[in-house]
């Protein structure tokens, strides 16, 4: 696993935590690149690959679903920080959730249908709580 910091590293968890989170969500051998980007790169990637005119928190790119699984997870640091603040979530816990979310996407899970979303969110919650973080789908007051 490779972690690329293309954004200011302030308040971004370290490589060891990313490795721990990926390991908790992964069910097969993989070669994964995690890239943490700023707002500008986040906007460019989301526009190019999803047709959206703003940055999003996480993008996942699967290159091979064979063994080893090959893919990239792109995290937009400013979006993640803003969401954590708006949702009263611990920033590290939010990063953990988004990494788990991205790794599940790499393994073929999605949330396009309501049924698939229930399955994926249930897995995310199970993994995140096993890592001793709060359920990411419970609104914090």
Curated annotation (Swiss-Prot):
Zn(2+) binds at residues 101, 105, 111. Its main location: cytoplasm. It is an enzyme of class 3 (hydrolase). It comes from the Bacteria. InterPro entries: MetalPrtase_cat_dom_sf_prd (IPR023091), YbeY (IPR002036), YbeY_CS (IPR020549). Keywords: Cytoplasm, Endonuclease, Hydrolase, Metal-binding, Nuclease, Ribosome biogenesis, rRNA processing, Zinc. One of its GO terms (biological process) is rRNA processing. Disulfide bonds: none annotated. PANTHER family: ENDORIBONUCLEASE YBEY, CHLOROPLASTIC. This is Endoribonuclease YbeY.
């Amino acid at each position: 696993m490779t972690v690329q910091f293309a954004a200011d590293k302030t308040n971004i968890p370290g490589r060891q935590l990313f490795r721990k989170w990926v390991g908790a969500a992964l069910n097969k051998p993989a070669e994964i690149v995690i890239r943490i980007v700023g707002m500008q790169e986040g906007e460019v990637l989301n526009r190019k690959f999803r047709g959206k005119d703003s940055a999003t928190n996480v993008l996942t790119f699967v290159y091979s679903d064979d063994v080893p699984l090959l893919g990239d997870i792109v995290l937009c640091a400013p979006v993640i920080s803003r969401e954590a603040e708006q949702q009263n979530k611990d920033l590290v816990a939010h990063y953990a959730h988004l990494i788990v979310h991205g790794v599940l996407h790499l393994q073929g899970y999605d949330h396009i249908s309501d049924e698939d979303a229930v399955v994926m969110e249930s897995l995310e919650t199970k993994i995140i709580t096993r890592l001793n973080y709060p359920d990411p789908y419970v609104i914090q007051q």
